[in-house]
């Protein structure tokens, strides 16, 4: 089974939950558990998730708060099954959406077996890292400090390393350095995580790499292109609703609505003569075709919903709610 087909089979697994699901019995020494990936915005949590599972299931961009939903990535080896939970970056919220994202990230800390606290190894430990560290000391969940972006460290990185050594020593956390971008030292990270897991069952079929349905990932791939192609004022005000997915033997038809808060943002997304919307659609279509390993017809619409990020009702309609 190809990587693309592993993701494309998600809906089949989910739709069969009411019946029998093919989950084998784990051997006696098998380990399994849930690992929460926690950290400030833009420290590389989603890039790490994609590297660990071996394919793209989480979108990435230079824009803070790219991740909005708790996304699970599943890594299964002969010895263990690791379920990684990628969470929104923890920050001070400024609206209802921000509050939902941060609450979900905090809930993840209490609902996992191990916390992987990811920091940016290209810069010294800062106030945002210490804020998260203070949250973690109130949790009984074991914590591993993961220092990412070692490939981007300056030649003289001694002070950077010392700042994280002090943090790890203060809280008595084991530490591992790696690069999510290049994959360097990720086997060592995975080995350390397995050491902290208990013996347990398969939670998911061994060939599954995420528990999210295709429609969710399609929406995220569209949002990713908006983050990459539009100016700073638009990305945080965007939500995607997948209105239709219609499969035929030759092509999959996808209709999606892009929700924004202001008419000016709608104008930016459409662009002169529809040029921006065309660019977004073309780039998103390519990514969705990789996801499902087939041809896609993608049609995008833009709708203004004033202050949707500040309305609990609107947030719920668009799929954003505090997770249990």
UniProtKB/Swiss-Prot annotation:
Region of interest called G4, as start-end residue ranges on this chain: 148-151
Binding site for GTP: 39-46, 86-90, 148-151
Keywords recorded for this protein, A-Z: Cell inner membrane, Cell membrane, Cytoplasm, GTP-binding, Membrane, Nucleotide-binding, Ribosome biogenesis, RNA-binding, rRNA-binding
All copies of domain KH type-2, residue ranges: 230-306
InterPro entries: G_ERA_dom, GTP-bd, GTPase_Era-like, KH_dom-like_a/b, KH_dom_type_2, KH_sf_prok-type, P-loop_NTPase, Small_GTP-bd
Function: An essential GTPase that binds both GDP and GTP, with rapid nucleotide exchange. Plays a role in 16S rRNA processing and 30S ribosomal subunit biogenesis and possibly also in cell cycle regulation and energy metabolism.
NCBIfam families attached to this UniProt entry: era, PRK00089.1, small_GTP
Oligomer and partners: Monomer.
Full protein name: GTPase Era
Organism from which the protein derives: Nostoc sp. (strain PCC 7120 / SAG 25.82 / UTEX 2576)
Annotated gene: era
């Amino acid at each position: 089974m190809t990587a693309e087909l592993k993701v494309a089979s998600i809906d089949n697994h989910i739709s069969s939950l009411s019946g029998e699901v093919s989950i084998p019995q784990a051997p006696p020494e098998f380990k399994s558990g849930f690992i929460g990936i926690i950290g400030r915005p833009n420290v590389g949590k989603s890039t790490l998730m994609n590297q660990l599972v071996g394919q793209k299931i989480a979108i990435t961009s230079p824009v803070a708060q790219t991740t909005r939903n708790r996304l699970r990535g599943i890594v299964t080896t002969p010895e263990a099954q690791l379920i990684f939970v990628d969470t929104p970056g923890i920050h001070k919220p400024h609206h209802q959406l921000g509050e939902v994202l941060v609450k979900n990230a905090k809930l993840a800390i209490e609902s996992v077996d191990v916390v992987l606290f990811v920091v940016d190894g290209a810069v010294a430990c800062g106030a945002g890292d210490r804020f998260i560290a203070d949250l973690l000391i109130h949790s009984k969940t074991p914590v591993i400090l993961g220092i990412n972006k070692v490939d981007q460290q300056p030649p003289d990185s001694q002070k950077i390393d010392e700042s994280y050594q002090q943090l790890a020593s203060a809280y008595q956390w084991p530490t591992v350095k790696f690069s999510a971008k290049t994959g360097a030292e990720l086997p060592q990270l995975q080995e350390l995580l397995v050491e902290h897991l208990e013996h347990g069952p398969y939670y998911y079929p061994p060939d599954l790499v995420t528990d999210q349905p295709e429609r969710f990932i399609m929406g995220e791939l569209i949002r990713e292109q908006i983050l990459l192609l539009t100016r700073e004022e638009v990305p945080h005000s965007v939500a995607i609703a997948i209105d239709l997915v219609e499969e035929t033997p030759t092509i999959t038809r996808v209709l999606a609505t892009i929700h924004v808060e202001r008419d000016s943002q709608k104008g930016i997304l459409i662009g002169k003569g529809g040029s921006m919307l065309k660019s977004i659609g073309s780039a998103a279509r390519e990514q969705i075709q990789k996801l499902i390993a087939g041809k896609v017809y993608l049609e995008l619409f833009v709708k203004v919903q004033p202050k949707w990020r500040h309305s609990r009702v609107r947030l719920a309609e668009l799929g954003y709610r505090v997770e249990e």
